[in-house]
C-alpha cells in the first residue's frame, strides 16, 4: 500500500506542551512535541502509522493567546498550500479557542476534498495518562 501523505500542522496548546511532575505548570515546546507526537504515532496500531508526514509549525502558543492576526496566519498557510497533495490534514491546537478555530476553518475550508481534523489534549504530552 502506498504511504498516505498527511499534513500535520502544529499550533501549540497543551497538546504541544510539557508539564512538571505535578502537571501544575506547562511549557509550550512545539518543536520538541513534533518529535514525540510522530514517535508515538509510529508506535501505534494505526494503519497510517507509516504515513508520509509533512510537519509545519505555524504557531507556538497556548491557544488562549490566539489573536485575529494568528488566525490569519493559519488561514494564509492553508490557502497557499496545495491540499490536494495530501490524504488529510491534522491540526494540533489548544482547547481554549478550539471551538472558534474549528468554526472559522469550517467556513474557510468549505469544499475541501480531504478530511481536516483538529486535535487537542487536556494533558501535556509527557503525562502518562
Question: Positions of the model-derived regions?
Answer:
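Active-site histidine-anchored catalytic micro-motif
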Residues: 1-129
